[in-house]
């Protein structure tokens, strides 16, 4: 039986030839080329992301101003449900009726019922604001004094 350069017979060499590494498989130049290509691809990706981020930041400043201006132009019917503003220096019938949630021409019984309902929810002894309780009582007194029985 003839032996090959690997020290095996020719039939054994043919049998195991697919498992034996070739002379240049895994050489350092191939690894360096693959690593270099990968590093270049990663570098280009980082550079592209940086340029895209810079472009986005440049667009955001004027776009933010446009968005803010358009948001101011939008009508807010849902926000107009609540009364905007504080209390006036001297309470009038309109403000008193807004506080109690009744019409300015409501009867005394409706005013008392609304006052009772609001004071139960906002009594100072149960954690409510003393200032708000004072304003609620002032509104009740004003509406009752100007309303006919």
From Swiss-Prot:
SUPFAM superfamilies, alphabetized: Chaperone J-domain
Cellular localization per UniProt: Mitochondrion inner membrane
Domain J: 95-149
GO CC annotations, alphabetized: mitochondrial inner membrane
Transmembrane segments: 35-57
One Gene Ontology biological process: protein transport
Matches recorded under Pfam families: DnaJ
Signal peptide interval: none
UniProtKB keywords: Developmental protein, Membrane, Mitochondrion, Mitochondrion inner membrane, Protein transport, Translocation, Transmembrane, Transmembrane helix, Transport
Segments on the Mitochondrial matrix side according to the record's topology features: 58-149
Xref: CDD domains: DnaJ
Residue ranges that the UniProt entry lists as topological domain Mitochondrial intermembrane: 1-34
Tissue: Expressed in the developing pronephros.
Record's bilayer topology term: Single-pass membrane protein
PANTHER family found in the cross-reference section: DNAJ HOMOLOG SUBFAMILY C MEMBER 15 (PTHR12763:SF7), PTHR12763
Record's function text: Negative regulator of the mitochondrial respiratory chain. Plays a role in the translocation of proteins across the mitochondrial inner membrane. Involved in pronephric kidney development at the early tadpole stage.
Record protein name field: DnaJ homolog subfamily C member 15
Protein source organism: Xenopus tropicalis (Western clawed frog)
Encoding gene, per UniProt annotation: dnajc15
